C-alpha cells in the first residue's frame, strides 16, 4: 500500500527530479508510485498504463467502436492519457503507440484524476491518467522481437525498438519498427434461397491478409516547467496492405470454378506537429500546430474463371476498382489557461483547421474477352474542402473539498464545399455547452455527473461512391448528408476495493437527432443504392461495470479484472418504420475478463472476451457479425534477467470461429423480389507467439523509475 496514495498539499514540494502536481490537483487524484508496478515488470509506459487499477485506455475519437474514423481538428480527438500533464501534439500516432515508445524506466509515477484537471479537451471524462516522467539525464530504450505461428505453418516476424535520450531539460525520443502483421484464415460461405431454404451456392475460401506498416517516428521536447515548454514530433509510415483470396465456388447444378480476390493498397502517411507554451498574465499560453498528409492508392480485383485452376481454366470475367485519393489536414490552435482567475480555473482557446480530400474512383466490369466496361457511380470523382473553426471557454470552481463544478461552451463553425461529379456548398454552426459535477460524498466514494452537447463530423469519404468487391456491392454517396447531434448524459461512481483495487460503475444516455446511418439513394438515372444518410431520433442507454480486484489474500500476486457492458440503442428504420438497433458495433452486451498472477520472475494469465452479434442495417441487406463462442487467450512471461523478458502466448485457445450472416434483398428492402441468406464462417485457428523484450540504459528493465533515478 505504500505505493498508492491520495495526493495532498505536500505533493507540491517535489524535488527537481520529480515534476510536481499542478496547483489544485491535490486531493483529487490517486497516485501510483513507480514501485507499485514493479510486480508487473513493465517494459514501456503502455505496460504501466494497462496495469493501473480500474483504468481502461481510451485512444480518442479517431479510434472508436466502429473502428478507425476520420475526425478533423485537434480539440475533439483527445483520449484519456496525458504525458507530464500535456497532450501529445499528434493524431497519426495513437496513444498506445506513443506510450509504447516511452521506456518504463523513465516513468516516476502516474496520477489518476477527473478530466477537468488536464484541460478542456478532457472535460467530462471521469478518468484521465497523467504519466509523469523522470528528469534524470541518461539513455533508456527497448527492443522487441516477435514471431507468431499460424495454422498453415507460416511464421510472421516483427521487430521494433525505441530509445529516449535526456540531457538537462531536453528529451529526444526515437522509434522505428517493421510493422509486419500477416494473418491467415479459412472458411466457407453458404447461400440459400430464403423462400425455399434450398442451398444455391457453396464456397470454400482461404484468405491471407498482410499489413506492412514500417514506421519511423521522432520527438524532441524541452521542458523548463508547465508554462515553459517546446515539443516537436514527426512520423512517417509507408503503409501497405495486401489480400489474396482463393475461392472455390460450387453452384448447385453447375460445375465448380475458382475465383480470386486480390487487394493491393498503398496508403502512406506523414505527419509533423509541435507546440510551444509560454507564461502570460499568471497563466500559460500554448500554441499547437499540426500537418498531416495521407495518400490512398488502392486496387481491388475480382477474377472469375470458367473452371478450376488445376485444369487451366481461363479467366472469363471479373471486376476491378481503383481508388486514388489525397487527404490533407492542417491545424493551428491557441489556448490560454490559468488555474486561479478570480477564484476560478479558466481556459479559453481557438482552433482553425483546413481539410481537403481529392478522390477518384474507377469501377470496371471485365467480360470474358477481357474488355472493360465502366460502371457508372453517382459520385466517383470529387474534391472536398472544409474550413473549420472553433472557439471555447471553460470555467471551474472547487466549492468544497468534496465538490467541484466545471462548465464550458464551444462554438463550432465550418464551411464545406464539394466539386466534381457533385456540387455542394454549406455552412454549419453549432453551440456545444457542457457541465460536469464532481463529488466525493465520503467513505472513499467518488461520483461524477456530466451533460454535454456533441456534433458528429461528416466523413469526407461519404461524399464518394465506392464498390466493395469482397461482398459484391456498391455504397452510394450523399452530398446532402448532415452531421448528427447528440445530448450525452453520464454518471460515474467508483470506490476502492481490497486495498488497491477498484469498483467502477458508468451509466449513460444519448439522445441523438439526425442519426447517421444508411438510406436509399436514387441517382439521376433512377439507379438505387444503399448509402449514408440521416434518420430520425436515436436513443442509447448503457451501463458499464468495472471490477479490478487484487486477490493476493487467496494467492500471492493474483489479480482479476472484469469489464462488462449492457446497452440498448433504438432508432426508426427508414424502410420498415419499425424501431431497431443502431448500425455498427453497438452490441447488447459484451465482457472482458482477465486473470493473471505475477511473481518476481514469472507472470502468467488468461483472458476471456465475447459480445453479442452486431448488425449493419443497409437498405439492401442486414449484415450481421458474430462470435461463435468465447475467445480465449493465455500467456506466460519469464524474466531470466532484470533486462530481459520472454513472453509465450496462445491466441484463440478454444479455436473459436467468427461468422457473418448477410440477409440479402434484391433489389432492396423497399420492394424485394428475392431474398437470400449468405452465411460466412471464418476460422483463424490457434496462434502461438513468442516475444523477446530487452531493455537497455541506466535503469533495469524490471522496475520503473524511482525518485531521483
Predicted segments with their positions:
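A beta-strand signature from Gram-negative outer-membrane beta-barrel systems
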Residues: 102-140, 695-700
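Extracytoplasmic beta-strand/coil segments of soluble accessory domains associated
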Residues: 46-87, 128
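C-terminal beta-barrel architecture of Gram-negative outer-membrane proteins
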Residues: 162, 457, 562-571, 582-640, ...
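Surface-exposed extracellular loop regions of Gram-negative outer-membrane beta-barrel proteins
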Residues: 295, 415, 439, 443-489, ...
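Short acidic/polar hinge/loop motifs at secondary-structure boundaries
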Residues: 86-114, 161, 218
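Outer membrane beta-barrel strand-and-loop segments of large Gram-negative receptors
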Residues: 329-333, 478, 482, 495, ...
Amino acid at each position: 500500500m505504500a505505493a498508492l496514495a491520495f495526493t495532498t498539499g505536500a505533493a507540491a514540494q517535489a524535488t527537481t527530479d520529480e515534476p510536481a502536481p499542478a496547483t489544485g490537483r491535490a486531493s483529487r487524484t490517486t497516485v501510483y508510485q513507480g514501485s507499485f508496478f514493479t510486480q508487473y515488470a513493465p517494459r514501456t509506459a503502455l505496460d504501466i498504463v494497462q496495469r493501473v487499477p480500474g483504468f481502461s485506455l481510451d485512444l480518442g475519437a479517431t479510434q472508436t467502436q466502429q473502428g478507425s474514423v476520420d475526425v478533423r481538428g485537434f480539440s475533439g480527438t483527445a483520449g484519456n492519457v496525458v504525458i507530464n500533464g500535456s497532450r501529445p501534439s499528434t493524431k497519426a500516432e495513437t496513444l498506445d503507440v506513443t506510450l509504447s515508445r516511452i521506456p518504463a524506466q523513465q516513468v516516476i509515477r502516474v496520477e489518476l484524476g477527473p478530466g477537468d484537471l488536464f484541460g478542456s479537451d478532457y472535460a467530462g471524462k471521469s478518468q484521465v491518467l497523467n504519466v509523469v516522467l523522470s528528469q534524470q539525464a541518461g539513455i533508456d530504450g527497448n527492443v522487441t522481437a516477435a514471431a507468431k505461428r499460424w495454422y498453415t505453418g507460416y511464421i510472421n516476424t516483427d521487430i521494433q525498438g525505441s530509445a529516449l535520450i535526456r540531457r538537462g531539460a531536453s528529451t529526444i525520443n526515437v522509434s522505428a519498427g517493421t510493422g509486419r502483421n500477416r494473418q491467415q484464415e479459412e472458411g466457407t460461405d453458404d447461400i440459400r434461397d430464403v423462400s425455399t431454404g434450398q442451398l444455391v451456392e457453396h464456397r470454400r475460401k482461404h484468405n491471407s491478409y498482410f499489413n506492412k506498416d514500417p514506421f519511423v517516428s521522432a520527438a524532441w521536447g524541452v521542458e523548463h516547467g508547465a508554462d515553459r515548454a517546446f515539443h516537436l514530433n514527426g512520423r512517417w509510415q509507408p503503409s501497405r496492405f495486401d489480400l489474396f483470396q482463393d475461392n472455390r465456388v460450387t453452384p448447385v447444378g453447375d460445375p465448380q470454378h475458382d475465383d480470386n480476390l486480390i487487394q493491393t493498397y498503398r496508403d502512406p502517411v506523414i505527419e509533423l506537429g509541435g507546440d510551444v507554451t509560454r507564461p502570460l498574465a499568471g497563466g500559460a499560453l500554448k500554441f499547437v500546430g499540426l500537418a498531416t498528409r495521407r495518400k490512398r492508392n488502392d486496387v481491388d480485383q475480382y477474377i472469375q474463371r470458367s473452371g478450376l485452376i488445376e485444369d487451366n481454366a481461363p479467366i472469363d470475367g471479373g471486376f476491378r476498382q481503383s481508388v486514388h485519393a489525397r487527404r490533407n489536414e492542417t491545424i493551428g490552435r491557441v489556448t490560454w489557461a490559468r488555474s486561479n482567475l478570480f477564484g476560478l480555473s479558466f481556459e479559453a482557446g481557438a482552433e482553425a483547421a483546413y481539410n481537403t480530400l481529392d478522390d477518384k474512383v474507377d469501377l470496371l466490369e471485365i467480360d470474358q474477352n477481357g474488355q472493360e466496361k465502366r460502371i457508372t457511380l453517382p459520385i466517383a470523382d470529387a474534391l472536398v474542402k472544409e474550413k473549420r473553426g472553433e472557439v471555447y471557454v471553460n470555467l471551474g470552481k472547487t466549492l468544497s473539498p468534496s465538490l467541484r463544478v466545471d462548465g464550458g461552451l464551444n462554438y463550432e463553425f465550418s464551411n464545406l464545399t464539394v466539386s466534381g461529379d457533385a456540387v455542394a456548398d454549406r455552412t454549419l454552426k453549432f453551440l456545444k455547452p457542457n457541465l460536469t459535477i464532481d463529488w466525493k460524498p465520503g467513505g472513499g466514494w467518488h461520483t461524477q455527473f456530466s451533460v454535454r452537447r456533441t456534433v458528429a463530423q461528416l466523413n469526407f469519404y461519404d461524399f464518394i461512391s465506392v464498390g466493395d468487391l469482397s461482398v459484391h456491392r456498391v455504397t452510394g454517396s450523399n452530398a446532402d448528408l448532415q452531421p448528427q447531434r447528440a445530448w450525452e448524459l453520464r454518471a460515474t461512481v467508483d470506490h476502492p476495493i481490497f486495498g488497491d483495487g477498484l469498483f467502477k460503475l458508468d451509466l449513460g444516455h444519448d439522445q441523438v437527432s439526425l442519426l447517421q446511418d444508411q438510406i436509399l439513394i436514387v441517382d439521376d438515372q433512377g439507379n438505387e443504392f444503399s448509402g449514408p444518410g440521416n434518420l430520425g431520433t436515436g436513443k442509447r442507454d448503457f451501463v458499464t461495470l468495472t471490477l479490478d480486484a487484487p486477490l493476493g489474500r487467496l494467492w500471492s500476486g493474483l489479480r482479476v479484472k472484469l469489464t462488462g457492458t449492457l446497452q440498448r440503442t433504438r432508432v426508426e428504420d427508414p424502410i420498415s418504420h419499425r424501431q431497431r438497433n443502431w448500425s455498427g458495433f453497438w452490441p447488447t452486451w459484451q465482457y472482458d475478463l482477465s486473470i493473471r498472477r505475477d511473481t518476481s520472475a514469472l507472470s502468467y494469465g488468461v483472458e476471456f472476451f465475447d459480445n453479442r452479434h452486431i448488425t449493419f442495417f443497409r437498405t439492401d441487406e442486414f449484415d450481421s457479425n458474430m462470435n461463435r463462442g468465447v475467445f480465449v487467450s493465455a500467456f506466460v512471461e519469464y524474466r531470466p534477467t532484470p533486462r530481459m523478458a520472454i513472453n509465450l502466448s496462445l491466441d484463440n485457445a478454444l479455436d473459436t470461429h467468427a461468422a457473418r450472416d448477410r440477409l440479402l434483398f434484391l433489389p432492396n428492402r423497399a420492394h424485394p423480389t428475392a431474398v437470400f441468406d449468405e452465411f460466412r464462417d471464418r476460422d483463424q485457428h490457434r496462434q502461438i507467439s513468442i516475444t523477446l523484450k530487452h531493455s537497455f540504459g541506466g535503469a533495469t528493465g524490471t522496475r520503473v523509475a524511482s525518485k531521483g533515478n
